[in-house]
């Protein structure tokens, strides 16, 4: 009795809420064996035939490829695609693919050569000696994905299951009307399917393996039971026919009684599900060493003369398959990829077959009936009764129409499996699944935009934080640099601190006064002298720095000279425009000329004492000399135009002439006695000597043109001139001696 109850509990099945029983229409195509289709002339292989990102291209236009050769590289969730036959890559461009939107996706276009040559195949007949990681990597690199309709990469799914999988379920229900691809595959290739199941079990090591199949497939059930006759590790469960019992959550509940939580996965409850076609593809990848390049596709509908199931190469145009099956289109013929409830209408027939293509339905006009006009919802709740996911389709419909995305999300629109049961039973002919698909797409787009905005905000905040850190570090550096004394001031600060400490120490010492003795102030005097010497040294250093800064800038010197010349020109113009009655004092003019010459000599000395690297422009020196000569001539004219009543002292003029000649001789001697390092411009010295001689001649002329009424003693004048020359010579010699 205990064994009877155990057997009953072992084979127990559960039933889910909702569901419908539409006409099956499977007998049109499940009665004939699988057959091959002739190769098409051109194949279009989309790079993305799965959930996830497309792989990286590893071929280019003009390459020769063989069947099974990878066209892309698979990394992470990127699943590679392979060449369905041998040929030449003629283009890599966007092409419309099998999708409700009919958007173009990047595809590899291959022209077949007709030879259909395989790449070298390396099968692992002894797969049990391989590690779990090696088997998963081989399955992934051979492009195996879920062939039941989702297209999730099988290798990633097996890797994510890990060691927590207790139950492996093989989905053989195939509940949607018209589709018989899995049914025919189990009838013709039952042994290979079971071998693929054993490979999956070897990878996952589950406690139990369950095959769920509907009772409307008697031939497939018989073939599987025959293959599993000697096996005790795999259990075949026959379930009642009900749509959509082939859904992942529904079949999991039917076989185990466990429900997948909202927003969760079946692996959260220790269950992993694979399709019958996926198990067959795993067997071919591991044991035969063949990547997935073809799959079983059902060709059915009253518009097809020879319905059945065929081995269709991936990338084959839909038109080629339909024409091979005797397609007879009507005026408004439609072709549906998938079943009548979950499939979608193709915009044109040039789209290729992909990994998730399981059926091509070409119904006649009478087969599906006339399209009904959409009417208003009457709140009958028939859709809620039929929903297998226990949702409220009428509420989701209103939320979808009203763009109320938050409420739709709260009502678990993500759990909708888009089975179409609600639309099937709706008396108002509302295409509820279309509304739900659009709403889920909009929610996904909003979440993607929010994710991008959050990432952009995070990048902005990180940048702002980095800028704030850099600013704080910069301010800290500036603050420390301002507070920290310079290296040259550290000694002065240390000396000041030492003096303060010394004074404090002296203040604490008692003062002893002895009668008849003088106090010893030598230490204090020495300290005072040291401070004075230090202050003088510091002042001298600052003075040298300022002088160096002043002398070292030749441009500043030139600017100052130009300003002085401009001021001199302005004074000359003012004197020239003065009233005629104004009396001109020749001595004052001579003094001003001497001051101007002194300033000129000072500027020349500053330029001469500049850095050795400074180059003297001879043209500029010539221009300055010419300007000086012009000023001298102007002063001579002013003195000549003075009033004749002005009396000139010939002795004073003689003395000035002698002094001028002495200065001229001194200038001539200075270049010889100058330091060898000093660079002297010979042209400039010659110009200055010429100017001095001209001034001497001018003074001699003034003496000759003196007023005749004045009585001059020639002997006194000669004596005075001789004395002046002697004094000038003596002063020049004394200055030379001092300079040496």
Curated annotation (Swiss-Prot):
<dbReference type="GO" id="GO:0009055">
    <property type="term" value="F:electron transfer activity"/>
</dbReference>
<dbReference type="InterPro" id="IPR019554">
    <property type="entry name" value="Soluble_ligand-bd"/>
</dbReference>
<dbReference type="Pfam" id="PF12838">
    <property type="entry name" value="Fer4_7"/>
</dbReference>
<comment type="similarity">
    <text>Belongs to the 4Fe4S bacterial-type ferredoxin family. RnfC subfamily.</text>
</comment>
<keyword id="KW-0479">Metal-binding</keyword>
<dbReference type="InterPro" id="IPR017896">
    <property type="entry name" value="4Fe4S_Fe-S-bd"/>
</dbReference>
<protein>
    <recommendedName>
        <fullName>Ion-translocating oxidoreductase complex subunit C</fullName>
        <ecNumber>7.-.-.-</ecNumber>
    </recommendedName>
</protein>
<dbReference type="InterPro" id="IPR026902">
    <property type="entry name" value="RnfC_N"/>
</dbReference>
<feature type="binding site">
    <location>
        <position position="426"/>
    </location>
    <ligand>
        <name>[4Fe-4S] cluster 1</name>
    </ligand>
</feature>
<comment type="subunit">
    <text>The complex is composed of six subunits: RsxA, RsxB, RsxC, RsxD, RsxE and RsxG.</text>
</comment>
<dbReference type="InterPro" id="IPR010208">
    <property type="entry name" value="Ion_transpt_RnfC/RsxC"/>
</dbReference>
<dbReference type="GO" id="GO:0022900">
    <property type="term" value="P:electron transport chain"/>
</dbReference>
<keyword id="KW-0677">Repeat</keyword>
<keyword id="KW-0813">Transport</keyword>
<feature type="binding site">
    <location>
        <position position="422"/>
    </location>
    <ligand>
        <name>[4Fe-4S] cluster 2</name>
    </ligand>
</feature>
<feature type="domain" description="4Fe-4S ferredoxin-type 2">
    <location>
        <begin position="407"/>
        <end position="436"/>
    </location>
</feature>
<keyword id="KW-0004">4Fe-4S</keyword>
<keyword id="KW-1003">Cell membrane</keyword>
<feature type="binding site">
    <location>
        <position position="387"/>
    </location>
    <ligand>
        <name>[4Fe-4S] cluster 2</name>
    </ligand>
</feature>
<feature type="region of interest" description="Disordered">
    <location>
        <begin position="602"/>
        <end position="717"/>
    </location>
</feature>
<dbReference type="InterPro" id="IPR017900">
    <property type="entry name" value="4Fe4S_Fe_S_CS"/>
</dbReference>
<feature type="binding site">
    <location>
        <position position="380"/>
    </location>
    <ligand>
        <name>[4Fe-4S] cluster 1</name>
    </ligand>
</feature>
<feature type="compositionally biased region" description="Low complexity">
    <location>
        <begin position="605"/>
        <end position="615"/>
    </location>
</feature>
<keyword id="KW-0249">Electron transport</keyword>
<feature type="binding site">
    <location>
        <position position="419"/>
    </location>
    <ligand>
        <name>[4Fe-4S] cluster 2</name>
    </ligand>
</feature>
<dbReference type="GO" id="GO:0051539">
    <property type="term" value="F:4 iron, 4 sulfur cluster binding"/>
</dbReference>
<feature type="binding site">
    <location>
        <position position="377"/>
    </location>
    <ligand>
        <name>[4Fe-4S] cluster 1</name>
    </ligand>
</feature>
<dbReference type="Pfam" id="PF10531">
    <property type="entry name" value="SLBB"/>
</dbReference>
<keyword id="KW-0408">Iron</keyword>
<dbReference type="InterPro" id="IPR011538">
    <property type="entry name" value="Nuo51_FMN-bd"/>
</dbReference>
<feature type="compositionally biased region" description="Low complexity">
    <location>
        <begin position="637"/>
        <end position="647"/>
    </location>
</feature>
<dbReference type="GO" id="GO:0005886">
    <property type="term" value="C:plasma membrane"/>
</dbReference>
<keyword id="KW-0997">Cell inner membrane</keyword>
<dbReference type="GO" id="GO:0046872">
    <property type="term" value="F:metal ion binding"/>
</dbReference>
<dbReference type="InterPro" id="IPR037225">
    <property type="entry name" value="Nuo51_FMN-bd_sf"/>
</dbReference>
<comment type="function">
    <text>Part of a membrane-bound complex that couples electron transfer with translocation of ions across the membrane. Required to maintain the reduced state of SoxR.</text>
</comment>
<feature type="domain" description="4Fe-4S ferredoxin-type 1">
    <location>
        <begin position="369"/>
        <end position="397"/>
    </location>
</feature>
<dbReference type="Pfam" id="PF01512">
    <property type="entry name" value="Complex1_51K"/>
</dbReference>
<keyword id="KW-0411">Iron-sulfur</keyword>
<dbReference type="Pfam" id="PF13375">
    <property type="entry name" value="RnfC_N"/>
</dbReference>
<feature type="binding site">
    <location>
        <position position="383"/>
    </location>
    <ligand>
        <name>[4Fe-4S] cluster 1</name>
    </ligand>
</feature>
<keyword id="KW-0472">Membrane</keyword>
